């Protein structure tokens, strides 16, 4: 089902994360059609609420069942040598998509895996914090990479359970690669500074503050990606000149159009 593109004798398979079912999927037209059908199955409103656990008749469980019936597995793990990590920006009819992309290469079978995650997502931000670790360099061997829903947390104000999405990134020794120290707290401080500045000028509208928060956190993590991570993977060394760009739009409407009630 994966897109394969010949590139210097190797094949590149593209992956993106669909957060409503919590599944890492191959990025291609066949997958996109299945995702669109699964969204119709549960309805737009239910889809936009995001991952809701796997108990009972949850939306995520229904979608996963439909995906499995159409050849898309619920769990995907990748491994290989880390050869690229960089900022990517794509313009589409419904906006500009700001992503982190990173590439693993399995030199034994000549296959490459290019993964795209939205910087606005918790999974994308966690991946950036891990790749910012000084121990991660070009050539670092990754024994296991996956993206999956984390533990739920209940918001008392809305009486809803929300799920962050997590990233597993294990090195050659099988140990989880740690987040770069301090980056998480620096991100919180950057967002607080932006929203506090707005509040100080009299803005207290929830929608305005949420937009400011989202913009601030994307800007912060983009800065970490561009200033700390990208220099570890110079493009001229990678030998990449845009040939690893997936064709067309993302498989799942990108960040899944989360509703405005998600707490920040």
Predicted stretch roles:
Residues 1-116, 128-130, 151-198, 207-219, ...:
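OB-fold ssDNA-binding interfaces and closely related basic DNA-contact patches used
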Residues 73-79, 123-147:
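Short nucleic-acid-contacting surface segments enriched for D/E, G, S/T with interspersed K/R
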Residues 82, 104, 137-142, 264:
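Short low-polarity hydrophobic stretches
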Residues 230-246:
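Intrinsically disordered, low-complexity mixed-charge segments
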Residues 246-264:
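Short acidic, low-complexity intrinsically disordered linear motifs used
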């Amino acid at each position: 089902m994966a897109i394969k593109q010949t590139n210097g004798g190797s094949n590149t398979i593209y992956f993106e994360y669909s957060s409503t079912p919590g599944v890492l999927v191959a990025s291609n037209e066949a997958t996109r059609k299945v995702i669109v059908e699964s969204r119709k199955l549960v309805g737009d409103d239910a889809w936009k609420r995001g991952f809701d656990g796997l108990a009972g008749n949850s939306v995520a469980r229904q979608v996963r069942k439909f995906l499995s019936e159409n050849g898309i597995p619920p769990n995907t793990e990748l491994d290989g040598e880390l050869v690229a990590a960089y900022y990517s920006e794509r313009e589409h009819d419904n906006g500009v998509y700001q992503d982190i992309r990173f590439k693993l290469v399995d030199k034994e079978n000549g296959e490459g895996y290019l993964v795209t995650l939205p910087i606005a997502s918790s999974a994308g931000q966690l991946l950036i914090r891990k790749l910012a670790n000084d121990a991660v360099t070009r050539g670092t061997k990754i024994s296991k990479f996956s993206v999956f829903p984390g533990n739920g947390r209940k918001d008392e104000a809305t009486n809803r359970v929300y799920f962050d999405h997590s990233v597993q990134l294990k090195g050659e020794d099988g140990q989880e690669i740690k987040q770069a120290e301090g980056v998480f707290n620096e991100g919180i401080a950057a967002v607080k500074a932006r929203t506090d500045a707005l509040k100080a000028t009299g803005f207290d509208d929830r929608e305005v503050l949420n937009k400011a928060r989202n913009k601030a956190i994307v800007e912060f993590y983009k800065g970490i990606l561009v200033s700390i991570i990208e220099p570890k993977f110079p493009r001229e060394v990678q030998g990449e000149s845009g040939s690893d760009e997936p064709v067309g739009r993302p498989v799942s409407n990108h960040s899944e159009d989360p509703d405005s009630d998600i707490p920040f």
